[in-house]
Amino acid sequence: MSNLNNQIQGKIFYTSDLHLFHDNVIKLNNRPFQDMDEMVKFIVNKWNTKVKNGDLVRIIGDVGYPKNKQDVENVIKILSILNGDKELVTGNHDTKFLKEKSFRKLFKKISVYDYAKDGKRKVVLFHYPIEEWNGYHNGSYHLFGHVHGNEDNLKQIDRRFNVGMDVNGFVPVTLDELITKAKI
């Protein structure tokens, strides 16, 4: 279980599926941006307005979709200007980034799966949605991404939340925000 919880001074946020420099994501997921430049500026502005230094952002996969070395470098530059400490639970599009030391240094922790704490609550972080997770019967939460806004084929399960950019206003969210949103 993640031991960073004891060192966090601010809030804990979650997000996934930034898909920086994935030109097709705007069209594929009907994102409300004219181009990648507009999307990146929007995400950086919203992120840095909400997340403060001392906060922690747990990114649950797919930070980008690099076509080449320049895209990898651009994603690293963008991540470095985003506020807050960062942890990464890798997604299916993160492999190319993991080869870069300058990318790995941006994160306090990198894992494929994480069972962590958010205050006194336990959270299972995995890029893909899981039907039943560690602590499921004891009140733990599962936070995932990958599906963007396409949840039509997913069974609705209590305490399982999509933290993807596409369904959360393109900004990281807290567990409390997800719980409140689910009650509406």
Regions found by a protein language model. Give the residues of each.
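Core catalytic region of metal-dependent phosphoesterases/phosphodiesterases
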Residues: 2, 13-15, 20-115
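Sterically constrained small-residue positions within well-ordered secondary structures
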Residues: 5-6, 79, 154
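A general structural motif
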Residues: 9, 53-54, 83-85, 120, ...
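Conserved beta-sheet core of the metallophosphoesterase superfamily
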Residues: 102-184
